[in-house]
């Protein structure tokens, strides 16, 4: 069994914010495949899908971003899931809007939701699907940026990014993290 976790904040007022790109991807995955009804479990909204014969839980923690680990840690322990089987989808300001980067592990990079996960599961060794939200405007704080909706001119990039991430998550669930990174991470141009 695997957990696919999308990070975000609960509540209507946060639905369309950049910080909720993880929730948006989870909803898009659920919309693209057959799934069980959503239910509340361990401070999260959870449903099940099947990928290549394996049960996968789609998870949207309802604890607010900075406390996401309070939901994921107990879910992992209840279902006896190894950290390497927890795929986490979240926003990344260091990537351009809609761009995807898959990593097998790593530090929090200053992301408070990831800090909470690391704290509650006790390791940095879980796969991440980082979805770009771009940098704040010069006059904006980081909080202003992540809690604002995407601009109208970025909507096409956002929708493409969500679609690409859905494809990458489902593909990586079938292929494994190493093959998934090879197939779905952007290819680097050779140095000349």
Describe the role of every protein-language-model region:
Residues 2-105, 115-129, 136-141, 156-192:
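Nucleotide and nucleotide-moiety/phosphate-recognizing core
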Residues 108:
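Conserved TIR/SEFIR loop-to-helix hotspot centered on a Trp-containing motif
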């Amino acid at each position: 069994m695997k957990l696919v976790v999308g990070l975000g904040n609960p509540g209507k007022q946060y639905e369309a914010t950049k910080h909720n790109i993880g929730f948006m991807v989870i909803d898009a995955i659920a919309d693209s495949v057959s799934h069980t009804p959503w239910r509340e479990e361990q401070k999260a909204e959870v449903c099940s899908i099947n990928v290549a014969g394996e049960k996968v839980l789609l998870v949207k923690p309802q604890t607010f971003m900075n406390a996401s680990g309070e939901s994921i840690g107990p879910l992992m322990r209840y279902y006896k899931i190894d950290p390497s089987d927890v795929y986490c989808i979240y926003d990344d300001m260091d990537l351009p809007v809609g761009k995807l980067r898959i990593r097998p592990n790593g530090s929090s990079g200053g992301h408070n939701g990831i800090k909470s996960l690391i704290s509650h599961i006790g390791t940095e060794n879980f796969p991440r699907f980082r979805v770009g939200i771009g940098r704040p405007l010069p006059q904006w704080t980081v909080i202003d940026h992540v809690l604002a909706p995407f601009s109208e001119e970025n909507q096409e990039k956002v929708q493409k990014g969500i679609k690409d991430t859905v494809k990458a998550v489902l593909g990586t669930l079938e292929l494994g993290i190493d093959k998934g990174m090879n197939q779905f991470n952007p290819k680097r141009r050779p140095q000349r």
